[in-house]
């Protein structure tokens, strides 16, 4: 531990923020190891609980990102800001939601619609697949909403991230885990 002026509590699930006279007074939590309910008294609180990405049906977020920290802050009367913004990672395996690293696009992967078009040409002709996440995410949604996506399971339509043109050697050297994930969880070999 680099700093000694705090104590770290792993395997605790915070449940409530205690506010007294409009000031932070403490926090309640459950010790996940033994199930005990614990009260922490304090003078200050930093909330770093992640977002709420798991609220969406298809997401690359981990199972723990359910908005509990945001809800806890809201219940305590703390102001929340910019709640309409949720950062999405634009590429994941359908239907599992396993994240496919942006490195796959960085190494030269193409986003293609069901007609085989590299549709990023319409939205970010200079940056193409290397455009920022928000642009890539909106572009994918536009393609799907306008009927150019692939029909997926349970109405979960999608586009393709095509790596085949990179060749086996480059994929095995630069993206071996992506190949392994695609084979194991999507039944597709990108080479």
How does the language model describe each region?
Residues 8-24, 29-30, 174-191:
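A glycine-rich dinucleotide-binding beta-alpha-beta segment and adjacent secondary-structure elements
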